[in-house]
Amino acid sequence: MIAPGDIAPRRDSEHELYVAVLSNALHRAADTGRVITCPFIPGRVPEDLLAMVVAVEQPNGTLLPELVQWLHVAALGAPLGNAGVAALREAASVVTALLC
């Protein structure tokens, strides 16, 4: 089962795209069939290139939480790793800042 913070490839694209799951455990337990995600870019993006990015240590990459998206869980492949609690919290605070 996919978990909060998991980084997974998208199976619904012919391109190599990755997302991080932002949905919390309560949302996942509701079993809606969908998850809230944001793009994950392998490697580092220069901080001055984009606003509101979140660095991830392992796997090394960058979250783009301002580009939040809802996806069906079937669109996600097996997780490659997990962004971790700190990165997930930072991404959630970016999403909250966009809405409030």
Swiss-Prot record:
It comes from the Bacteria. One of its GO terms (biological process) is negative regulation of growth. Keywords: Toxin-antitoxin system. Toxic component of a type II toxin-antitoxin (TA) system. Upon expression in M.smegmatis inhibits colony formation. Its toxic effect is neutralized by coexpression with cognate antitoxin Rv0298/MT0312. This is Toxin Rv0299. It comes from Mycobacterium tuberculosis (strain ATCC 25618 / H37Rv).
